[in-house]
């Protein structure tokens, strides 16, 4: 009997991405405190740790499952850029990103219960924002779209209009690197195909 697949996430984007490939899964909110910007830890360590916390929390209740967790951060000049606190903060973040490259890191953790076997991985993509105007920033922020997103933009929505180019995995930038997730699941004997 195949184990239930559980996505440990509150993210509408991760839910959509996993749903779009047509597999059956259950969404469970992990309710964990995520680690944010830290001078002592790298973005790789932070996203891996946050993804792992999510699957471990959900594993407390689901003892016969494959549990998927993920975390994504935006990094500019070595600094983690989180979700904006308010519209003013979103404008500030988007001005900092304007006409520059930044990196997006996503950590993915997959746990099989009851064995508690865990695999983790981190994917990095590079994004170049275009030289958009202050007026474009204000119009974009007024849509409300950037308010729940690391880096204050959503590449899968209107935020795509702010991006000049990407290098790497598009789905990583959205928040769930599907190809890497599939390779982790393959090691448990599962496939997204």
Swiss-Prot record:
Annotated positions for site Important for substrate specificity: 13, 72, 156
The organism's place on the tree of life at top rank: Bacteria
Alphabetical UniProt keywords: Cytoplasm, Hydrolase, Nucleotide metabolism
GO cellular component: cytoplasm
GO BP: any one term: nucleotide metabolic process
Pfam family, one: Maf
Keyword Cytoplasm tagged: yes
Locations listed in the record: Cytoplasm
Cofactor: a divalent metal cation
EC code: 3.6.1.9
SUPFAM superfamilies per UniProt: ITPase-like (SSF52972)
Active site location: 71 (proton acceptor)
Predominant localisation class: cytoplasm
Enzyme class: hydrolase
HAMAP family per UniProt: Maf
Protein function: Nucleoside triphosphate pyrophosphatase that hydrolyzes dTTP and UTP. May have a dual role in cell division arrest and in preventing the incorporation of modified nucleotides into cellular nucleic acids.
Protein name, entry field: dTTP/UTP pyrophosphatase
Organism: Dictyoglomus turgidum (strain DSM 6724 / Z-1310)
